[in-house]
Amino acid sequence: MAPLKLNSRNLSQIAAAGGALVKIPTYQRGRAVKEGIVHIGVGGFHRAHLAVYIDQLMQKHGVNDYAICGVGLQPFDSAMRDALASQDHLYTLIERSAKGSFAHVIGSINSYLFAPDNREAVIAKMAHPDTKIVSLTITESGYYYNENTHELQSEHPDIQFDLDPANEKAPRTTFGFLYAGLTRRYQQGLKPFTVMSCDNMQKNGSITRHMLESFARLRNPEVAEWIAEEGAFPNAMVDRITPQTSETDKTALAEKFGIVDSWPVVTEPFTQWVIEDQFSDGRPPFEKVGVQVVKDVHAVEQFEKHKLRLLNGSHSALGYPGQLAGFQYVHEVMANPLFRKFVWQMMQEEVKPLLPEIPGVDIDEYCNTLIERFTNPTIMDQLPRICLNASGKIPQFIMPSIAEAIWETGPFRRLCFVAAAWFHYIKGVDDRGKPFEVVDPMREELQAKARAGGNDPSELLSIKSLFGDDLRNDERFLREITTAMNDIARDGIMKTLPKYIN
């Protein structure tokens, strides 16, 4: 039987052909359900995480008032619009592990709005009474958050554009849209929707609240006060490794499962979501599908810290040195005994001692689980994905551990090696002289500083929005990172790495 194009009409045939390896949604969609969630930033992670939890609620528990309306704000989001529209907003989740692979057609995304075509439609959707939650996966740079001052980058041209009352009906940024939608709800006497960040940032809800309230105060203090008093911005920790989809993935889906999908998602079996129970206008019963909903924001912060420092910090330790050494995939780096030892020792000796204990969580078991996930060869997680937008990641995943280790007089040599590897990575040339693309919103500034500094980290460390003042004035840190930078420049990653392994 020839592979079938994914759409509503072909679902039953796809299920029959796929047998036990393929699951399809059997719940109602379209006008039969309410779209209670508007999600900005429909990428791979959203479609492997929140959309899957909602799919499970719809499939297993009959929840029909929290279907998702996806939103794309950027011109490049037209590709997702077209892919989803071509298959009735269905897509395939491919779950891969050493035990095999399974395909799950997800139907929780009910519609999609492309803001550049109709910005008013997005604002109206947010203001609709059915909308209870606006969720976000907009990456770190989408929050316009200054890491040094912890304030909104109000001087940014896009924020300035959205702050101009003349542009209220045609915003550019997430905060411009959120403000416009909330203002309309305020005028209509509705409750504010919950703004639910699903991005990989510590205190993501608190940061979102502060950025939006800061934006609103610059536009209308009355609306800002209403948001501050009535709004909800739950903090959350999210986790599921989701590599970029390749053409090989699409071909394999057609050959093995008989599904032709314009943009499937590949992911691992592991998934986790810990979220603070803070919602302004109701929420789905997330607990029914394995979400850890907690009352105490401190508990969320502890889970966040574990995940960001151990998983994401270790990803950084594999990504930047690994790409410089010429590797392509995470599992390839982990197959190298030197890297495997390095990452394990960094987690155990430098990061673990800085982390709080969480009742019911065994940190050693968590670290072992991470090693197992990193070594999964079936998801083909590419290093360039790990290395994307590092200016928003390294200040969260690596530098705080270094700062805390210095404060507590603990070891941090391996963490400095990772930071030094990123400083070399910024130059866009690996140890063999092969150029690669550096994708980062701060690329021009970073590369200019890297060229000016050479093997001296002081130029890059002068970027206060990333590093502040304390670290660049600490002698121990400067000595360690300068040594690592010089060693990498002289000997390359693979010859330098043994110096950082016991």
UniProtKB/Swiss-Prot annotation:
The keyword NADP applies. One of its GO terms (biological process) is mannitol metabolic process. It is an enzyme of class 1 (oxidoreductase). Keywords: NAD, NADP, Oxidoreductase. It catalyses: D-mannitol + NAD(+) = D-fructose + NADH + H(+). It holds the Pfam family Mannitol_dh_C. InterPro entries: 6-PGluconate_DH-like_C_sf, 6PGD_dom2, Mannitol_DH, Mannitol_DH/Oxidoreductase, Mannitol_DH_C, Mannitol_DH_N, NAD(P)-bd_dom_sf. NAD(+) binds at I37, V38, H39, I40, G41, V42, G43, G44, F45, H46, R47, A48. GO terms for molecular function: mannitol 2-dehydrogenase activity; mannitol dehydrogenase activity; NAD binding; NADP binding. It comes from the Eukaryota. Its EC number is 1.1.1.67. Catalyzes the NAD(H)-dependent interconversion of D-fructose and D-mannitol in the mannitol metabolic pathway. Has a preference for NADH over NADPH. Belongs to the mannitol dehydrogenase family. Monomer. This is Mannitol 2-dehydrogenase. It comes from Aspergillus fumigatus (strain ATCC MYA-4609 / CBS 101355 / FGSC A1100 / Af293) (Neosartorya fumigata).
